Amino acid sequence: MWESRSVSEQQPAVPAPTPVPEVHPVWEELEADGPQVGIVIPDEADRERIEAACNELLERAITFEVRVLSAHRNPREVAEYASTAMLRGVRVVIAAAGGAAALPGVIASYTELPVIGVPIERGNLGGMDALMSVVQMPDGVPVACMAINGARNAAIFAARILAQGAPPPAEF
């Protein structure tokens, strides 16, 4: 049968508080001179489609890098890029893709950085297939979706994201 116990016998003693470990800001370890924006395209042929984004970032004096990585042809390299981008100084990723447009979502699944997806027009569907792929990310894998071929808007949006962590401009 059941034994009768006092309250102090039934509940374990409260453990002593654990000392709080010393915390140092992780930002000090990040590469300060790295590119602020990472632009990823799945194929060298897509470079012209992101030219407007590159020009916009150059005009705004925002550093960036362009990488050619395919979610289908080299998924390990995509995972490596996305998981280490923050350590290299990247603060926002722009990922352009057409067709199945898996690239933005795959990158978002491997990083905590904001990811901006740019659907690219390819084939007979006029980019609608890519748009639907980018805009319909599963719960927990957020990707901001621009218009079809909206690379320039992606760069402007990236600049606005970066501005959130910067001091306000001296003049408006």
Question: Which residues are covered by each model-predicted region?
Answer:
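SAM-dependent methyltransferases
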Residues: 1-37
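C-terminal binding/interaction regions
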Residues: 24-32, 41, 45-46, 126-172
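Glycine-rich phosphate/diphosphate-binding loop of Rossmann-like nucleotide-binding domains
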Residues: 34-73
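Short beta->alpha connector loops at strand-helix junctions that form conserved
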Residues: 41, 97, 118-121, 146-147
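Short glycine/serine/threonine-rich phosphate/pyrophosphate-binding segments
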Residues: 46-51, 75-78, 97-106, 125-128, ...
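Active-site-proximal loop->helix
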Residues: 54, 79-82, 109, 125-138
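N-terminal beta-loop-helix "entrance" segment that forms/cooperates
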Residues: 66-87
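Glycine-rich phosphate-binding loop
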Residues: 81-119
